[in-house]
Design a protein with these regions (language model features):
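Active-site neighborhoods of divalent-metal-dependent phosphate/nucleic-acid chemistry enzymes
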Residues: 63-109
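Acidic, PIN/NYN-like endoribonuclease modules and their adjacent C-terminal/linker elements
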Residues: 1-2, 98, 102-128
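Generic structural signal for small/hydrophobic residues in well-ordered secondary structure
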Residues: 6-7, 43, 76, 101
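Acidic active-site catalytic centers that drive phospho-/nucleotidyl reactions
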Residues: 6, 94, 112
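Short, well-structured N-terminal submotif of metal-dependent ribonuclease cores
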Residues: 1-35, 44-58, 128
Length: 128
C-alpha cells in the first residue's frame, strides 16, 4: 500500500527521532513512502539554509511522486466544503493531500490530528 508521508512526519524524520526514522526508513526501502506537491513545497519552504534547501531538494527527487490532476483538485474542494459545513476548517493543502490519498488508493501518515476528520481517508499510524 502507498503511504503519503506528511510534512509533520518528515520534520521528525529529519530531526532523527528514532521511532520515526526506523519506520520511514523501512517504508523507503520497500517503496511504500510517497510524496506529493504540497509536502515538497512545505519541506522546502522550511529549509534553514541554502545548503539544507539543496539537500532536501536533491533527496525529495528520489521519492515516488503522486501527480495532482483535475479530479484531485475537485475532491479537495469538495472535502473542504463539506468539512466547513460541519464547522471544521482544515488547511487546503491538507485537503489536497487527503484528496490525492483517496483518489490514488493511498493512506496518509501525519501527526496532524485534523486528518482524522476527513471521511474516507485511510490513515497510517505515525510512530510515537
Amino acid at each position: 500500500m502507498k503511504v503519503i508521508v506528511d510534512t509533520s512526519v518528515w520534520i521528525e524524520y529529519l530531526k532523527n527521532r528514532p521511532s520515526v526514522t526506523e519506520l520511514i526508513d523501512r517504508y523507503l526501502l520497500t517503496g511504500k513512502a510517497y510524496t506529493v506537491g504540497p509536502v515538497i513545497a512545505e519541506l522546502l519552504q522550511g529549509a534553514k539554509t541554502e545548503e539544507d534547501y539543496k539537500t532536501l531538494n536533491s533527496n525529495i527527487g528520489g521519492l515516488p511522486f503522486i501527480e495532482t490532476n483535475l479530479d484531485d483538485w475537485i475532491l479537495a474542494g469538495k472535502l473542504s466544503f463539506k468539512l466547513r459545513k460541519r464547522g471544521i476548517t482544515i488547511p487546503i493543502t491538507d485537503c489536497i493531500i487527503a484528496a490525492l490519498a483517496i483518489n490514488h488508493n493511498a493512506a496518509v501518515m501525519s501527526f496532524d490530528r485534523h486528518f482524522q476528520s476527513i471521511p474516507d481517508l485511510r490513515l497510517e499510524t505515525a510512530p510515537k
